[in-house]
Swiss-Prot record:
Cytoplasmic side, ranges: 1-17
Molecular function, one GO term: oxidoreductase activity
Main location group: endoplasmic reticulum
Subcellular localization, as worded in the UniProt entry: Endoplasmic reticulum membrane
Organism: Pongo abelii
Gene: DHRS7B
Binding site for substrate: S194
Protein's recorded name: Dehydrogenase/reductase SDR family member 7B
Active site feature: Y207
Enzyme class, spelled out: oxidoreductase
Length: 325
């Protein structure tokens, strides 16, 4: 049986509930509105940041680099496309300029042909790049090579080749272009690394080592360039459906020539390129563009290293068994 005091308090409780609900809902919608406005301003600022920016992209003739060229071009950037194959670069420029789907003013790209493993060529290429527009706003270090093999079977020459392409080449090009950015107190360095720059998986030692080195170098660079107002972004994709595994080198330096299942099931390079564009436009510092499990593995490596190492050892046993069967 409800007491008289309880009956008297019920209207007060209902009134308080009504006041609380009517106060919280507008506050909630206001917060959502502010968040939406913030995201809209981020999007607009990112678009403005990329429009007419001089963007250099290495490894632009295929895979992620080619798709990055397309999205940066469509965003109105002034492109300098780099690669080893001049014919493929010219074909890409014809493909870009033939498109009429862009909503902003576009600019005919320049091309610079050179090999990232040739230190002498990099110095000359940097000078040629600067001659195109007189300066560089954004450098996208995308070119790279993958690797498959056991550590014991892999020659040191192969280790060096992977490091030259994935680490020393981008470092040399970055150092060659940095003085012009420092002089202007303006610039943005982007390193397309890999999830394997944060975790290491078996039979990828040379590749993982080169990407770990990339992560470390550009993290250091970010801190050192802060005083010059130069941005540094490290992007770590997971598996992307490109020919990266097909063109990978093996333990003896020969071409792997196989599309791995994980690569075949990877994300579309078109989607990843859009994410790269967004990350650069928002000036993000460090971005992981991988599926849930690889992303969780990054945290597992730190929070439960013993479990992570056991899982990698198990993976190595399974891969070894499948190759021997």
């Amino acid at each position: 049986m409800v007491s008289l005091a309880t009956r008297k308090s019920l209207p007060k409780v209902k009134a308080m509930d009504f006041i609380t609900s009517t106060a919280i809902l507008p506050l909630l919608f206001s917060c959502l509105g502010v968040f939406g406005l913030f995201r809209l301003l981020q999007w607009v600022r990112g678009k403005a940041y990329l429009r007419n920016a001089v963007v250099v992209i290495t490894g632009a003739t295929s895979g992620l680099g080619k798709e990055c060229a397309k999205v940066f071009y469509a965003a109105g950037a002034k492109l300098v496309l780099c690669g080893r194959n001049g014919g493929a670069l010219e074909e890409l420029i014809r493909e870009l300029t033939a498109s009429h789907a862009t909503k902003v003013q576009t600019h005919k790209p320049y091309l610079v042909t050179f090999d990232l493993t040739d230190s002498g060529a990099i110095v000359a290429a940097a000078a040629e790049i600067l001659q195109c527009f007189g300066y560089v706003d954004i450098l996208v270090n995308n070119a790279g090579i993958s690797y498959r093999g056991t550590i014991m079977d892999t020659t040191v020459d192969v280790d060096k080749r992977v490091m030259e392409t994935n680490y020393f080449g981008p470092v040399a090009l970055t150092k060659a272009l940095l003085p012009s950015m420092i002089k202007r107190r303006q610039g943005h360095i982007v390193a397309i690394s890999s999830i394997q720059g944060k975790i290491s998986i078996p039979f990828r030692s040379a590749y993982a080592a080169s990407k770990h080195a990339t992560q470390a170098f550009f993290d250091c660079l970010r801190a050192e360039m802060e005083q010059y107002e130069i941005e540094v972004t490290v992007i770590s994709p997971g598996y992307i459906h490109t020919n990266l595994s097909v063109n990978a080198v093996t333990a003896d330096g020969s071409r792997y020539g196989v599309m791995d299942t994980t690569t075949a099931q990877g994300r579309s390079p078109v989607e990843v390129a859009q994410d790269v564009l967004a990350a650069v436009g928002k000036k993000k510092k460090d971005v992981i563009l991988a599926d849930l499990l690889p992303s969780l593995a990054v945290y597992l490596r730190t929070l439960a290293p013993g479990l992570f190492f056991s899982l990698m050892a198990s993976r190595a046993r399974k891969e070894r068994k499948s190759k021997n069967s």
